[in-house]
Amino acid sequence: MKPLTYTLVVNGPQYGTQSARNAYLFAKALIEKGHILKSVFFYQDGVLNGSSTHVPANDEFNLLQGWQSLAQSHQVQLETCVAAALRRGVVSEQEASQHGLASHNLAAHFTQAGLGSLAQALLEQDRVVQF
């Protein structure tokens, strides 16, 4: 069977719901089965997954590091919706500079993108799965 290409859409934050964790586990399973995960688009409260300022307890899985490892190991694009991110205080270095902010908190391996990026994924990937 030919491997399928996927994009995941994550609407839930790291904490408070299981959607982000389930998306991560699904992403790992896809890759283990030989499919290709092209990107993960974080939307609505899901953009909070891209914040570098979360500090989980020592005995908890660090979901941010999990996403970053996935991006590094499998060339997965991690994209936060720029509009949703700015509204929730997740700011890239470029956006911080543009808006005159003293600091930024978008985690390494995450980028900010518009909804056009998600629309492109809808056209190009074999499957888009929302969490």
Swiss-Prot record:
Active-site residue list: 81
GO MF term set: sulfur carrier activity; sulfurtransferase activity
Highest taxon of source: Bacteria
Pfam families associated with the record: DsrE
Matching InterPro entries: DsrEFH-like, Sulphur_relay_DsrE/F-like, Sulphur_relay_TusD/DsrE
Compartments reported by the entry: Cytoplasm
Keywords: Cytoplasm, Transferase
GO cellular component terms, A-Z: cytosol; sulfurtransferase complex
GO biological process, one term: tRNA wobble position uridine thiolation
EC number(s) given by UniProt: 2.8.1.-
Family: Belongs to the DsrE/TusD family.
Function: Could be part of a sulfur-relay system.
Protein name from the UniProt record: Sulfurtransferase TusD homolog
